[in-house]
Amino acid sequence: MTATGRRLRADAERSVQAILEAAERVLKEDPAATLEQIAEAAGVARTTVHRRFANRDALLAALAESAWRQIAGAVEGARPATAPPLVALHQATANILAIKSGWTFALGQPATNEEIGRLQQAVYAACDEVFRRAQQAGDIRAGVDLAWARQVYLALINETAHGPTGGGEPDAAAARILDVLFHGIG
């Protein structure tokens, strides 16, 4: 989509996706990289980058928005409102870990526009819903502060994705996260 909401042609969408993927790779290595360096890594002309993104800030916002769209889609794909709560939580966790490993720079950017904030809130709301359903099913003790549980859960995901050992295979890492979350370390 363009800034005006018009749908891009398929080749233009491919160019934008190539630019975003190259931006993630290049900026992860050198956060001060120029748009020209990103264009070179994407295999497109510098003018193509400038035509799609007015400036560096616009590119960074689009990069973060794209990554958060993927996260939101991954969470929704886990069927948080209909799947059994622990199944939804495991699938969402594995999906998120798979995305986080490829979009570390983008997901580390601050929410710079309303759409990113909306996507983040949708992800957090889905997480809260799964936690409520898990508590109702008896998987989480009554009386547990679900807001605190979500913070711990998200911290476990972030540490798994960005910690010194790396995340590993997403499904196995999700199982480890949920084991620690639901059974502790003792």
Which residues does each predicted region cover?
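Amphipathic, non-transmembrane alpha-helical scaffold segments
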Residues: 12, 64, 68, 116-124
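Basic, helix-initiating cap at the start of DNA-binding domains
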Residues: 1-29, 33-41, 58
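Amphipathic alpha-helical interaction segments
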Residues: 18, 37, 58, 87-91, ...
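Short hydrophobic/aromatic patch on the recognition helix
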Residues: 43-53
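Hydrophobic alpha-helical connector segments
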Residues: 62, 73-101, 112-115
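Alpha-helical DNA-contacting segments of helix-turn-helix folds
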Residues: 53, 60-67
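C-terminal peripheral helix-coil segments that are non-catalytic and often amphipathic
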Residues: 1-3, 91, 121, 125, ...
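All-alpha amphipathic helical-bundle segments outside canonical DNA-binding/catalytic cores
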Residues: 87, 115-119, 136-152, 168-173
